[in-house]
Amino acid sequence: MTQSNSRASGATRDHLGRPIVAVTGIGLVTPLGIGVEESWAGLLAGRSGIRRITRFPTEHLKTTIAGQVDLPEEAGHGPLTSPGRVERMAALAAEEAIAGAGIGRKGAFPGPLFLGMPPVEVEWPQRLDLARGGVGAEGSKYPALIAAATGRTELFEGALFGGVGERLADRFGTRGAPIEITTACATGASAIQLGLEAIQRGEADAALCLGAEGSVQPEALIRFSLLSALSTRNEDPARASRPFEKTREGFVMSEGAAALVLESLESARARGATVLGLVLGAGERADSFHRTRSNPDGGAIIGAMRAAIADAGLEPGQIDYVNAHGTGTPENDKMETLGMRAVFGEGCPPISSNKSMIGHTLSAAGAIEAVFSLLTIRDQRLPPTINHETPDPAIPLDVVPNVARDARVQRVLSNSFGFGGQNVCLVLGAAA
């Protein structure tokens, strides 16, 4: 029995006998707004959330634009550090998702937490503060910094990678040890994959899956700039992110968070939950080719796409739309096109990039784009790829240029391709 027929008959198991996994809650924080509906409305309207950076001085930087999220508690105060922003945005998204799912009692989520987040470290303002606390000319040297940090437990806790997940787990009362993961730009999708597989294995009936990113800060911006990965179209921020377009020249850094409440379909039905969509399958492949570049043969990208479709029990022709990784770098868009043509042949479905409007949210991207994929299915409307002014003849794809479009969408492939060849693809489907 095919998976689609299995779902149509009301079954709760997929083509491999695993529990079908439903999404019953979603939450979003993006440069377009805080909350699912505000972000989604902005995306369908083709509105850009990219603007000039106001959080720190940019006079001597090559790139001075980003997708910033303005948090309410920052008004009139200094910005939170990156770990603080990650935790706060993850909490906002999780609160929205859990409330929408109506699951568990307050502070007691009935499943594990899977958190995708960036590596964290002490940032420049904190280092300068420690240096000032050192002794004379030796203050900037490592032993003096260690001495100045003695007793500063907030620095240690803020830069402790696992600490963010532990605090979120305490806040929402998730079960078991929280899992934090970072797989470069595939991180958010990896968190969803972990939740999907935990439910499929019967280890949990529900999971809280989060992807969060808060790295719009000087050091991260400079590091990506040194890789020549960022757009320098500073004079017109809204038009800087140009996935699949001929004049593209780099991605735009951004931040945000997304949360998904996953449940076995059987559990969701038993408690009368509203099912927003299904996570039908996941595929991952790594190529270990280079620290930042993908193998030019596209093998891992193609393999991840094919693996996700096969895991869902589908054929490529059953995918109605692809939510692109679509960063706007010359190499990534070329590689994704290669993957599309290899997997779908001449009959490629429409593909569009949310990053044209919200920028590249890095560790959060896979989770944010999974939520947008579910909303695409819900509303039967494809979000556009904006800033598509000059088509690239090397990219013969329908990229839904500039304007959203009504379409029949039952299944979406959502692509996440990360530095170091870490690739994760998800297949999302309509509720039964």
Please annotate each region the language model reported.
Residues 155-156, 176-183, 245-249, 351-360, ...:
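Short pre-catalytic strand/loop immediately N-terminal to key active-site residues, enriched for Gly-Thr
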